[in-house]
From Swiss-Prot:
Known EC number: 2.7.7.18
Domain of life of the organism encoding this protein: Bacteria
UniProt keyword annotation of Transferase present: yes
Family to which the UniProt record says this protein belongs: Belongs to the NadD family.
One Pfam family cited in the UniProt record for this chain: CTP_transf_like
Gene: nadD
Protein name: Probable nicotinate-nucleotide adenylyltransferase
Keywords for the protein's UniProt record, in alphabetical order: ATP-binding, NAD, Nucleotide-binding, Nucleotidyltransferase, Pyridine nucleotide biosynthesis, Transferase
Source organism of the structure: Shewanella woodyi (strain ATCC 51908 / MS32)
Single biological process term from Gene Ontology: NAD biosynthetic process
Catalysed transformations (reactions): nicotinate beta-D-ribonucleotide + ATP + H(+) = deamido-NAD(+) + diphosphate
Pathway(s): Cofactor biosynthesis; NAD(+) biosynthesis; deamido-NAD(+) from nicotinate D-ribonucleotide: step 1/1
InterPro entries in UniProt: Cyt_trans-like, NadD/NMNAT, Rossmann-like_a/b/a_fold
Broad enzyme group: transferase
Described purpose of this protein according to its UniProt entry: Catalyzes the reversible adenylation of nicotinate mononucleotide (NaMN) to nicotinic acid adenine dinucleotide (NaAD).
Length: 209
């Protein structure tokens, strides 16, 4: 199987996560996209709601959209969530599958600061959600890696890992921070959240301060 993986805090999960993942799945003809909530992100100290609540919200999205599947491997780990550790565990248990880790451009630009980042290329392809008109600067610290590994979506056959695949996606002016701010002010961002997530947040009285 060809499986995309979208990791994130998902605090809360919203259309800014969902829509780009759907576009990536369609462009690459993936069988599934796993939504993988982090438990203890190395670069974040806390989240606004519990891990269990973020898992439940992510599961609601998977229930509504059949192309998604919940991956709880990081959320259930009682240690910092380093991607390379997670991918080693996943590829060991799914040796015949091809994995595509989905990230934004900001993550790509800081990739060389990630724990054992060069090992990622032996475990998966990296899909970069690309804003219109963007290109990587030659001054970037990962430019040489990018140049040697970048491929267009229609030229990725024959390799199970190691490529960087930029995919133009529709810009989404949505952020979890802004959603939390709106909710704390009593505003329900109906255009940013699926109905089931809105209902869950209201039922659990989340993000209200």
């Amino acid at each position: 199987m060809r499986i995309g993986i979208l990791g994130g805090t998902f605090d809360p999960i919203h259309f800014g996560h969902i829509r780009p993942a759907q576009e990536v799945k369609q462009t690459l003809n993936l069988d599934k996209v796993w939504l993988m909530p982090n438990h203890i992100p190395p670069h974040k100290t806390s989240t606004s709601v519990s891990t269990e609540q973020r898992l439940e919200m992510t599961q609601l999205v998977c229930d509504e959209y059949s192309e998604f599947e919940l991956c709880a491997i990081e959320a259930k780990r009682e240690a910092p969530s380093y991607l390379v550790t997670t991918l080693k565990q996943i590829t060991n248990s799914h040796p015949n599958d091809e994995f595509f880790f989905i990230m934004g451009m900001d993550s790509l630009l800081s990739l060389d600061t990630w724990f054992e980042w060069q090992s990622l290329f032996g475990l998966c392809h990296i899909v970069v959600c690309q804003r219109p008109g963007w290109s990587l600067s030659p001054d970037s610290s990962i430019f040489s890696q990018y140049q040697s590994r970048v491929r267009s979506p229609n030229k990725i056959t024959g390799k199970q890992s190691g490529l960087i695949i930029p995919i133009p996606v529709t810009p989404q002016a949505i952020s979890s921070t802004h959603i939390r701010e709106q909710l704390s002010e009593g505003i329900t961002p109906t255009n940013a959240l699926p109905d089931k997530i809105i209902q869950y947040i209201e039922d659990k009285n989340l993000y209200r301060t």
